[in-house]
């Protein structure tokens, strides 16, 4: 856990000097720890309940709307691109090897969620816990059976700048249980096979081999050509 918290590449720096990594982890924790916030009136708040009110108020307004729009008419104009063959592929039951493959593709030391375990734990002890985890994931994917707390998350606030003061200087990040991430990864792997066929050629994200910077380069070249 100390290695995970320190965010240091152990393969390059070794793992013998534990005091060094403890100091790194402590420094990082102190830098990211939220001990105060500035409210909308510019007043510093150090009480935990006051900071909680600021966070709930800000993100509550951010992720809600006072003018909801009905998208049903808009969706009627969207032409379906998923063929019958694609649909048969998507609804085909998941199998155990897809669960194992999804776990192998996960970064070992991602921050843990409510389960308290990084993917490395499951990867290392798969011979022991693999059967139980596989059954849990397949029951969810194929039959919609989810155990209690399956999709619970821990929401942590990550600083967007070096010295955050306001709640706007933080972005929320959801930390999910590993089993839940395995299920979502398995679904994503299945979608990869049909995404190139249903996503526009002008969409430069989500499809393997396309870069989000491609559209930026196209826009730059277009403006350069117009200005000539």
Each language-model region and where it sits:
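Short, charged alpha-helical motifs in flexible N/C-terminal segments and linkers
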Residues: 1-57, 88-148, 227-228
């Amino acid at each position: 856990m100390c290695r995970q918290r320190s965010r240091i590449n152990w393969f390059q720096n070794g793992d013998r000097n534990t005091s060094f990594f403890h100091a790194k982890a402590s420094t990082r924790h102190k830098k990211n720890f939220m001990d105060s916030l500035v409210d909308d009136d510019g007043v510093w708040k150090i009480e935990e309940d006051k900071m909680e009110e600021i966070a709930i108020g800000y993100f509550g307004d951010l992720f809600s709307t006072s003018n909801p729009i009905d998208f049903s008419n808009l969706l009627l104009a969207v032409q379906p691109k998923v063929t019958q063959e694609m649909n048969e592929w998507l609804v085909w039951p998941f199998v155990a090897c897809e669960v194992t493959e999804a776990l192998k593709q996960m970064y070992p030391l991602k921050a843990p969620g409510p389960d308290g375990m990084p993917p490395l734990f499951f990867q290392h002890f798969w011979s022991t816990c693999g059967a139980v985890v596989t059954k849990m994931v397949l029951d969810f994917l194929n039959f919609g059976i989810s155990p209690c707390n399956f999709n619970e998350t821990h929401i942590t606030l990550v600083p967007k700048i070096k010295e955050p003061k306001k709640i706007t200087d933080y972005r929320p990040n959801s930390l999910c249980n590993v089993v839940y991430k395995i299920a979502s990864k398995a679904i994503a792997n299945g979608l990869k096979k049909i995404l190139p066929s249903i996503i526009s050629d002008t969409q430069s994200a989500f499809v393997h081999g396309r870069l989000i910077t491609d559209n930026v380069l196209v826009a730059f070249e277009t403006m350069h050509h117009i200005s000539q």
